[in-house]
């Protein structure tokens, strides 16, 4: 609730044109099998296990505290290949909302280049792309009891938004263009939740919002319970907001450049520091 109060200004902002670059798995590939992969997990108590993730998150500005919060919801996955070559990808497990304990695929990101520019982006071979979602439920409650769910086009965007506004909610990534199967699957399990659609602030993202709201209306959701949740100002997506990377295209289109996330994040850190100091002062006085 606090996040929504703080970021209520972000709702229903006007919306740049960006085709999705997610590489979908081949239709003729064999079904996804977790046993085909070697998995390296992030252990919050073991610094050595964390080091391998550094290059995947560094250029995205995603810090260790955010990685700790989401550590159960990502890993490094290396597929067993017949040619003997090995490639580790940052993997975000896809699940079905009705069976959130079974992995049905991966949203994948390759290791970035030395200059930080993007590498491979796609889904693992055989992934259930039509229904599978990355669902990071940080609430400690069953998914069906969630009050607020935030949707994104990528797990990177979800983690970025959390770092800007660290509230333990349900974070969801469609891994590209949202499908009707993904929409109906999650909406059917969470009929009492409010859904915030943090898709990209461009023409495609705006269409994704319209599509999801249409499906939600057909399923009986109240209009105000499914809302757009784009970044304020001239930021295309939530990771750009975290990096304070403004879109020249949005600026050229006349998007009001009235909000600066670097200032917003700095103010939040300063407030936390003040609270910490006040708490320490109180304990010393007692």
Predicted segments — roles?
Residues 11, 61-62, 165, 190:
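A broad structural signal for alpha-helix termini and local helix breaks/kinks
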Residues 55, 159, 210:
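Alpha-helical elements of the RecA-like P-loop NTPase motor core of helicases
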Residues 3-59:
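Non-catalytic accessory segments of DNA primases and related replication-initiation nucleases
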Residues 63-85:
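Short, basic/aromatic recognition patches
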Residues 54-64, 88-95:
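Serine endopeptidase catalytic core focused on the charge-relay Asp
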Residues 163-286:
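TOPRIM fold recognition
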Residues 3-9, 73-76, 246-247:
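Short, small/acidic-rich helices and loops at N termini and domain boundaries
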Residues 81-188:
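Phosphate-handling DNA/RNA-contact segment within nucleic-acid enzymes
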């Amino acid at each position: 609730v606090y996040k929504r109060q703080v970021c209520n200004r972000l709702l229903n902002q006007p919306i740049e044109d960006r085709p999705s670059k997610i590489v979908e798995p081949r239709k003729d590939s064999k079904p996804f099998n977790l046993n085909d992969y070697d998995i390296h997990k992030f252990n919050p108590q073991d610094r050595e296990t964390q080091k391998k993730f550094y290059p995947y998150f560094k250029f995205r500005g995603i810090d260790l505290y955010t990685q700790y919060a989401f550590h159960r919801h990502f890993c490094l996955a290396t597929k067993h290949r017949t040619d003997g070559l090995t490639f580790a990808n940052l993997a975000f497990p896809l699940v079905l909302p009705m069976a959130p304990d079974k992995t049905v695929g991966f949203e994948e990101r390759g290791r970035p280049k030395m200059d930080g520019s993007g590498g491979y982006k796609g889904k693992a071979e055989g992934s259930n792309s039509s229904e599978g979602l990355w669902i990071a439920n940080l609430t400690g409650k069953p998914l069906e009891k969630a009050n607020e769910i935030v949707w994104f086009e990528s797990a990177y965007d979800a983690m970025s938004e959390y770092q800007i506004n660290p509230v333990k909610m349900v974070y969801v990534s469609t891994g590209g263009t949202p499908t009707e199967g993904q929409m109906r699957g999650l909406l059917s399990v969470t009929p009492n939740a409010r859904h915030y659609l943090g898709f990209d602030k461009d023409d495609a993202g705006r269409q994704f919002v319209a599509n999801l709201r249409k499906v939600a209306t057909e399923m009986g959701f109240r209009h105000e319970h499914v809302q757009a949740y784009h970044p304020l100002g001239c930021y295309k997506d939530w990771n750009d907001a975290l990096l304070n990377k403004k879109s020249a295209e949005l600026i050229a289109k006349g998007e009001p450049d009235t909000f600066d996330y670097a200032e917003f994040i700095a103010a939040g850190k300063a407030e936390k520091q003040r609270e910490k100091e006040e708490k320490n002062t109180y304990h010393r006085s007692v």
